[in-house]
């Protein structure tokens, strides 16, 4: 029996990611990879039940994308199976584990057919596992990944103890936001915002001339690295205060500061 799909407009952010996927082809650039180290006994059957409960709860996890005429749309499946894929890595070194996590996280998604969520369980020992969730950014972000982990933990805890998970009903799904956004930006409001950005971006360079230490490659490789730095407590507190005063998250504040830095070039 075929699975029914419910069709909604894509948000503008989803439309951009769809366009990039169609332009550049299958890629892992927009894969979100979240690994969690689990210590102690693990009931894999309960973990699968938890996944089976979370997927129906969040429409985004059952969403794929398609073109309808000239518009990108979300196709929300009425039901979708997401198996927990197990892999035995007993005795593996940290380097082998890291390589396997990178390999699993680098597999591309098919936005048109989905699913856009993969769940991997890497067994390191009888009481040691790594749970890896891989999602495409078109249906998730770091904030929603935290919600997914929270709900998974709640369902797993309930199923493993024979209790009933007490999770609140979700009054709004992402598709509801997409519909609202399309309605809000219809007509005059969209034209007003487009006019603002056309004016402010007039004459902007097509590429930032950053003071990098080596030539920019002709083709973008997406190779990169990460640099971590701890902020002093006093500075962190001041940033939190400023973010609260402006009604934004700390991420939004720091991202604005980063973009301000880039604007120097």
What do the PLM-derived regions correspond to, one by one?
Residues 234-249:
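Surface-exposed, Lys/Arg-rich phosphate-binding patches that contact polyanionic backbones
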Residues 223-236:
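DNA breakage-rejoining catalytic core of tyrosine-based enzymes
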Residues 263-265:
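Secondary-structure transition/capping motifs at alpha-helix termini
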Residues 79-85:
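Short, charged/polar, Gly/Pro-enriched secondary-structure boundary elements
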Residues 2-78, 91-184, 192-211, 248:
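Acyl-group handoff/entry surfaces in thioester-processing enzymes
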